[in-house]
Structures are given as C-alpha cells and as structure tokens.
Amino acid sequence: WPASPSSGGCLDEPNDPNRGDVHYWKVWHGNRPFTEYRKYFFRYLSEFGFQAFPSVKTIEQFTDNEEDMNPFSYIMEKHQRQYSANGKIMGYMQQTYKYPNSFPTFVYASQLLQADGIRYGVEHFRRNRGRCMGAVYWQLNDCWPVISWSSVDYCGRLKALHYYAKRFFAPLMISCEEQGMMSSEANMNREHFVFEKSIRLNVANETMQDQNVTVRWALRDP
C-alpha cells in the first residue's frame, strides 16, 4: 500500500471515501459534533481521534502544586502540544456533560468524553460493515506525559477509551442508533424545537457462529 491515506494509486484523491483508506478529523480539529460521523461511510477509516487528559496520578508526576492542577495553568499548557486544545476539550464537554466541580473530576470526564466520541464513530462504522471494513483510532500510547489522543498514557495507565475499546471492538457487539427529526414547536411559550426520536438496536456478530443472546434495553435519567 503506497501511503496512508491513499486511494491506491499515486496522488489520485488520497482521501477518497470510496477507495482505499481515509483520515477523518472534522470531529476534533473541525469542531464538529460526534454525530458528524454518521454522515460518512468510508471504506476504511485508518485515522481519527479525540484528546483526553492522562490519569491524575500521571499528572501529579509533572506538576509541583495545586495551582498547576488547572487546564490552563502554565505547566498544563506546556504538556499540551496542540494550540488551544485544552479549551477545545472544554467546549465539547459543555455540550455533553454537566461541568465538573473539581480538577480530578474534569480529568475523568475528559476521558469519558474521548471514549464516547470514539465509540460513537466505531459503532456507526461497524453497523455499516460491508461498506466500511475497518476503523483505527489515533492513537494507542504516548512518548512523554502529555494531554493527547492516546488511550494509554505515558505511564502505562489506561484511559477510559481503552476500556471502551474492548467493548466496541468485541467480536459480538450491540449498539443503539437513535433516529429522529427536528420539528418546530408552534407555542412560543414552550421550547421552539423538539426532537421526535426512535431507536434501532443493532448486533454485530463477527464470530462466524450463530449466537443466542438476551438484550435488555432501558431509558434512564442522565
């Protein structure tokens, strides 16, 4: 294979979603929401990702005091090699979770955010197996203690994404695809928009054997 991404020949549209492998970064670098993944049906997604903070125990190894335990402290920014990325994490976080009330909680929430984002993409691509035959997230590990796209930090501590990956890459996996449309609410004293949603459960079975399973599904308050 000549390169990555590549459509299989020279420089002929190397990021062509219909041929070869693709790198996709509109989610994260392009600030697009996780739902953006569902607009695409790549043949093979060989690079995509989302950042998260390393374990608090790892952070404690490169910080000196409590003042450093802040996403925008001098030392924390020095351990973030993408400009303004800590703010980007916070921007995505406020769209997804209630804002954490402590730095350790913030660190953990950043890892859950990363895990949910990658899970959202992988589940979509696995639901479309046949069209999409692979998804490889960037990246596995780090070469120094840093806030990054990795699922294993520099000290070998697993982020939430690494635990999630064991589930969403399992040979037998169930996923839920919510479906719906936005409709206008005529009553001005109420919300202007409401979402009418339904759900579709999908089971991906790559064991090459028939499986008997029991599915339990429920709604709960966030």
Regions found by a protein language model. Give the residues of each.
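Conserved anion/nucleotide-ligand pocket segment
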Residues: 1
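Substrate-binding clefts and catalytic carboxylate motifs of secreted carbohydrate-active enzymes
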Residues: 5, 9-211
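Intrinsically disordered, low-complexity Pro/Gly/Ser/Thr-rich segments with frequent PxxP/GP/PP motifs
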Residues: 213-222
